């Protein structure tokens, strides 16, 4: 594959423009540094060891990840300073966590209940170490996280246990990330994270600990949250490659570039209204937002649309006024990058549209 033009690749496939990727990573890092914030980017988006390493090389303080199986792959690849952002409860996941901590004992984990805290303290005792914990705060999603009413007492208990070490709090508002209007998004996120910051201050005063972490934020609120004094680090993920959902919201600073695109080929053109392509729901995660077609056969176009009418697992429908011929390659920005990436095995990395590397999506399918 190395040396081929991207239009020669078999489809459907994911292509990453390396220069745009690096630009996005460096842009985020410089922005955060100017605001005196750390970046602990979330690898749930790209699921790729090579991209993690680029982020660390650019100055990220560590890597955020959701599942123990994902974290274990990163630890084996010598990616350090991990934050696992979802509670680890089952015996199988706790066994995986034990393996992670043996490779990377500085790893941090979130906790949101007394019951889970007891499990983690017991694991720390068995491993003869103190496990680094952030108290996870429910940001209003109702998904994970302790309530603001219970988080203070939970933090004190973490601090009192012999085999756990309180490092701070996490408050991630995923439901704010795609609020279209910047002002509405800013108002919501600022109110929430200031409330979390007051909680952090109360915990510091009660425990005598200083400089506790306040982690959270995403691609939709990174610029807003970086102006909040109590926030110490941000966890954006999609900024690396971007997607249509994030291009649709209002930012007050410059946009990141569409570093990742999906290529699909026209396989049937027997109708005047549409053509059929080889990317269905097995290649492209279905959202209410449609993909944005940006080119056919390398030529810019704005008159084609990928429609979500039911064309099946293997096929997609492209309509428009200037329909492409059989064999044409369609390039598009995907609606939602995280789950789309999880459908693929590899990234084809290009410079000037020529493949220069093939990177495994090593965390793909690591759901446990």
What are these regions (language model features)?
Residues 21, 44, 74, 135, ...:
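Conserved, mostly hydrophobic/aromatic
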Residues 37-38, 205-213, 326, 344:
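Flexible, glycine/charged-enriched surface loops at secondary-structure junctions
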Residues 138-251:
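Active-site loop/helix belt of alpha/beta enzymes
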Residues 270-368:
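C-terminal accessory subdomain/extension
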């Amino acid at each position: 594959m190395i040396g081929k033009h991207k239009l020669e690749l078999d489809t459907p496939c994911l292509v990453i423009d390396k220069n745009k990727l690096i630009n996005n990573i460096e842009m985020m890092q410089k922005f955060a540094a100017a605001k005196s914030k750390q970046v602990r980017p979330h690898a749930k988006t790209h699921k790729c060891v090579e991209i993690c390493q680029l982020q660390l090389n650019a100055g990220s303080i560590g890597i955020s990840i959701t599942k123990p199986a994902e974290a274990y792959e990163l630890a084996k690849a010598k990616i350090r300073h991990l934050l696992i952002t979802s509670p680890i409860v089952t015996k199988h996941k706790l066994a995986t966590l034990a393996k992670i901590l043996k490779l990377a004992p500085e790893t941090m984990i979130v906790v949101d209940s007394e019951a889970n805290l007891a499990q983690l303290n017991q694991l720390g005792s068995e491993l003869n170490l103190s496990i680094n914990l952030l108290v996870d705060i429910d940001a209003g999603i109702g998904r994970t996280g302790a309530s603001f009413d219970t988080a203070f007492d939970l933090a004190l208990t973490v601090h009192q246990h012999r085999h756990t070490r309180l490092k701070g709090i996490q408050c991630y508002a995923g439901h704010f990330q795609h609020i279209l209007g910047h002002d509405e998004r800013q108002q919501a996120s600022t109110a929430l994270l200031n409330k979390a910051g007051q909680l952090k201050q109360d915990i510091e005063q009660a425990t005598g600990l200083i400089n506790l972490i306040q982690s959270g934020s995403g691609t939709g609120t990174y610029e807003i949250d970086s102006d909040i004094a109590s926030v110490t680090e941000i966890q954006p993920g999609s900024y690396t490659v971007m997607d249509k959902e994030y291009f649709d919201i209002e930012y007050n600073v410059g946009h990141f570039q569409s570093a990742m695109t999906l290529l699909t080929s026209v396989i049937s053109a027997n109708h005047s209204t549409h053509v059929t392509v080889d990317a269905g729901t097995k290649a492209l995660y279905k959202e209410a937002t449609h993909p944005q077609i940006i080119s056919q056969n390398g030529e810019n176009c704005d008159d084609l649309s990928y429609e979500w009418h039911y064309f099946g697992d293997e096929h997609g429908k492209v309509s428009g006024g200037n329909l492409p011929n059989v064999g044409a390659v369609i390039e598009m920005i995907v609606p939602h990058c995280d789950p789309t990436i999880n459908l693929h095995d590899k990234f084809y990395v290009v410079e000037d549209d020529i493949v220069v590397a093939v990177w495994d999506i090593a965390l793909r399918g690591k759901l446990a």
